[in-house]
Structures are given as C-alpha cells and as structure tokens.
C-alpha cells in the first residue's frame, strides 16, 4: 500500500522549522496516522502554524509547504491536501500613538523599564488593529514560552496588575 506517514515524514524533513527568518516562524505541532502496527497507514494528518510580521511571507510559506507535501506525495503515488486558515494578520502600533505614550508614562511613574518589543504572539489586539483600533499587548512575563517548561512568576503578575491600575 501507499505509506502516508512515509510521505509526510519526507515532506516534514524538507521544511525549515522554528525561526525561518527574523520575521517568520513555522512549526508542525501534531502528526496523526495509522490504525495498527501491522497495517500500512493510508492517511496521515499534520497540523502546524506559520507566524510572520510580514503577511506576504506567511502566505509564501503556506505555498511552499503545499508544494513540498505535493511533491513528496507524488513520489509514492499518493495525494496531499493542504488546507490553511488565516487566524490573524500582523500589525504594528506607531510609536507616537496614544497607546504607546500612555504605556511609557505609566511605566515611568512605576519605575518599570517599559520596553517595547515585537512578538509572534496573537491576541485580540490583532482584530482591533485590523479594524483600525490602535493598542498594545501587555505581556504577563512568560519564561520558556511555548515549551513544556513555560511559567511566570507571582511578582510579574503583581507588576502587571500594578501597570493596569496605573493605565486605568
């Protein structure tokens, strides 16, 4: 039979995972296939995500992924179906916006550094920005983010609450 996991594994081995470049990340997070150890798996389903500060690069990575899976499937007379959903589009809040200046002022009052950074994370703010509403995402201070060792501290949570109080 046609070994779907074999084709999928070959495709995954050709993909660049993690930080593809400074603006884009790519991850295959789940792989499911097969029904028993003595049966050739005729289906394999993978899920993953692409995040990028540049929407065009995200779409380009989707097209590249589809091409690679199709090529590897064709090598063993299988088929590949790649579906994608756009959950969010990257945005940038201007440094001169009221959101930024209010944030920096609150941080100064509290003695916090008020560091502005980019993030590959998604939030409700992506939807707000898409609809012309400027804002910032205030981090809860995650360590080892998106790993099995992810955590935060009570102190970081407390400081976050202080900052929110100052902004209100």
Q: What is the meaning of each model-derived region?
A:
Residues 9, 59, 63-66, 101-104, ...:
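Generic alpha-helical structural signal
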Residues 9-19, 62, 88-136:
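Active-site-adjacent substrate-binding region
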Residues 31, 112-163:
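Zn-dependent metallopeptidase/amidohydrolase metal-coordination segment
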Residues 1-4, 96, 150-157:
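Short, conserved glycine- and acidic-residue-centered signature motifs
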């Amino acid at each position: 039979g046609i070994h779907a996991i074999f084709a999928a594994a070959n495709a995954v081995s050709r993909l660049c995972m993690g930080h593809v470049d400074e603006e884009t990340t790519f991850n295959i997070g789940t792989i499911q296939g097969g029904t028993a150890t003595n049966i050739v798996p005729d289906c394999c389903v993978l899920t993953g995500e692409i995040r990028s500060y540049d929407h065009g690069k995200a779409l380009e990575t989707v097209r590249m992924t589809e091409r690679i899976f199709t090529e590897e499937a064709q090598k063993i007379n299988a088929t590949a179906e790649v579906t994608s959903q756009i959950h969010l589009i990257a945005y940038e809040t201007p440094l001169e916006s009221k959101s930024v200046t209010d944030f920096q002022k609150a941080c100064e009052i509290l003695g916090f550094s008020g560091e502005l950074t980019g993030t590959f994370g998604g939030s409700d703010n992506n939807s707000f920005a898409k609809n012309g509403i400027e804002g910032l995402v205030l981090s809860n201070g995650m360590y080892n983010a998106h790993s099995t060792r992810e955590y935060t501290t009570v102190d970081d949570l407390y400081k976050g609450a202080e900052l929110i109080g100052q902004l209100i």
